[in-house]
C-alpha cells in the first residue's frame, strides 16, 4: 500500500468557532495550532496545509495561570540601536486582546510560507460577535 499524500486542492476545510471565555492561553493555543495544521485529520500531510478555519471569540477573557499576567513578557524591536520595546500580558491584553492568542499560536506553527498560510486561517475577536456567520461555523468545545 502506498503512502497517502494529500493534495492541496482536494482538502476539505471546515469552519469552527471556539469560545475563549476563562480558557487558559497555552492550552487553547496548543489545540488551535493542532487544528490549524490539520493533525486531527486522517489525511494529515506535513508539507500540505490540511487544517480547518478557526474563529475564536471572547479572546479578551483568556487567562493565564500563576503570576504570568505580570511576569510574561512580549518583546518587539524597532530596528534601531536600543529600540527594544517590552510589554507584559496584562497590558497587551488590554490594548490588543487578539494579539495575545495570535502570538501564542504563531509560535506553535511551522515557520515559513506554509506556517503563514495556516496562521491566516485563524480569526480572533475580542467580543462575542464575529462576521463569519455565512460560513456556518460549528461550535468546537476545547
Curated annotation (Swiss-Prot):
It holds the Pfam family Ribosomal_L13. GO terms for molecular function: mRNA binding; structural constituent of ribosome. It comes from the Bacteria. Transmembrane segments: none annotated. One of its GO terms (biological process) is translation. One of its GO terms (cellular component) is cytosolic large ribosomal subunit. The keyword Amino-acid biosynthesis does not apply. Keywords: Ribonucleoprotein, Ribosomal protein. InterPro entries: Ribosomal_uL13, Ribosomal_uL13_bac-type, Ribosomal_uL13_sf. HAMAP family: Ribosomal_uL13. This protein is one of the early assembly proteins of the 50S ribosomal subunit, although it is not seen to bind rRNA by itself. It is important during the early stages of 50S assembly. Belongs to the universal ribosomal protein uL13 family. NCBIfam families: rplM_bact (TIGR01066). Part of the 50S ribosomal subunit. PANTHER family: LARGE RIBOSOMAL SUBUNIT PROTEIN UL13M (PTHR11545:SF2), RIBOSOMAL PROTEIN L13 (PTHR11545). This is Large ribosomal subunit protein uL13. It comes from Azoarcus sp. (strain BH72). The lineage of its organism: Bacteria, Pseudomonadati, Pseudomonadota, Betaproteobacteria, Rhodocyclales.
Amino acid at each position: 500500500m502506498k503512502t497517502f499524500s494529500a493534495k492541496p486542492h482536494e482538502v476539505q476545510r471546515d469552519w469552527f468557532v471556539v469560545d475563549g471565555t476563562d480558557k487558559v492561553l497555552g492550552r487553547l493555543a496548543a489545540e488551535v495550532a493542532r487544528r490549524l495544521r490539520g493533525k486531527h485529520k486522517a489525511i494529515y500531510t506535513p508539507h500540505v496545509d490540511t487544517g480547518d478555519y478557526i474563529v475564536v471569540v471572547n479572546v479578551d477573557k483568556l487567562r493565564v495561570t500563576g503570576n504570568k499576567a505580570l511576569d510574561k513578557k512580549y518583546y518587539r524591536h524597532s530596528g534601531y540601536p536600543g529600540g527594544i520595546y517590552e510589554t507584559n500580558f496584562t497590558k497587551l491584553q488590554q490594548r490588543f486582546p487578539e494579539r495575545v492568542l495570535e502570538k501564542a499560536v504563531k509560535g506553535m506553527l511551522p515557520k515559513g510560507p506554509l506556517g503563514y498560510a495556516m496562521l491566516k486561517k485563524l480569526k480572533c475577536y475580542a467580543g462575542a460577535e464575529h462576521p463569519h456567520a455565512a460560513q456556518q461555523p460549528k461550535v468546537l468545545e476545547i
